Amino acid sequence: MRRTAAFISALVITLMVTLVSGCALSVPEGFNEVKRAKELYDKLDSGRLTMTDLSSGETLMEFSFFINAKDEMIFSYLSQDESGTEGAYSDGAQFFYKNRGEEKWRIISTEDESYLYNLYSKTYRYPYARGSVFFLDGTSVGAAQVTENADGSLTVSYEYDPEKLNKNAVGMLDGVSEFYALSAVYEIAADGCIAAFTETGSVADEQGGRSDVNIRLEVSDPNGVYDIPSPVGELEEVM
């Protein structure tokens, strides 16, 4: 069974909390470079992130952001699958969102108790603007390969050990009860920032159903985004 965009988006976001630093133990080859690349992504003032399902070639998610002079994060997020389109947009002062299966957008007003939690900045970043979106677990790598490319970029490939992942990560993964296989490729640009991340594998959900994961995240226009058109359509009337 192929994963839907909704599950994959949730999986990537949930994987963000599973970073293991390696503590005082030795870390796999390339780990420090990947860790630094993630940290540099965390410091970007703007950029774009695209998620693609490599099995179908479909674009599952598009996210773009920039930080304005007021330290407000302006961003647009759109994710789609067979159940519809999910979206979020912030102009820095207002937050809009659209649920899958719904035609109209909604706005979180200043009267809403969650209003402040939906205003983002350079330090309080939207999840897809955080380096932790690129999964990295230094304690569960079974095999590692690092390739230095002619243009100064670096490719780090990890084959994760499912048994170690099941021991170290499953308890923290929403909707995943077991890993069968997982591999990851980290493409690091010559400036040290992460340029792309590919993740393939097979996992079981909470009901025991087995599903494949085959996604690619690509970063473009790092510190080169200065304007983001609003995707917000018709708003639902507030009663």
Regions found by a protein language model. Name each.
Residues R3-S26:
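Sec-dependent N-terminal signal peptides of Gram-positive bacterial secreted proteins and lipoproteins
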Residues T18-K70, G224-M239:
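N-terminal leader/targeting segments and the immediate start of mature chains
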Residues Y41-G47, S64-F75, A88-F96, D151, ...:
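Short, solvent-exposed coil/turn segments at beta-strand boundaries
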Residues M51-S56, S76-D81, Y97-G101, T198-A204:
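Beta-turn initiation residues at beta-strand->coil junctions
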Residues T59-F63, S83-G87, L182-A184, V213-L217:
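A structural detector for short beta-strand units
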Residues S64-P127:
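An acidic-aromatic
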Residues E102-N168, V176:
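Flexible, processing/modification-adjacent segments and terminal tails
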Residues G152-G233:
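Gly/Pro-enriched, hydrophobic low-complexity segments
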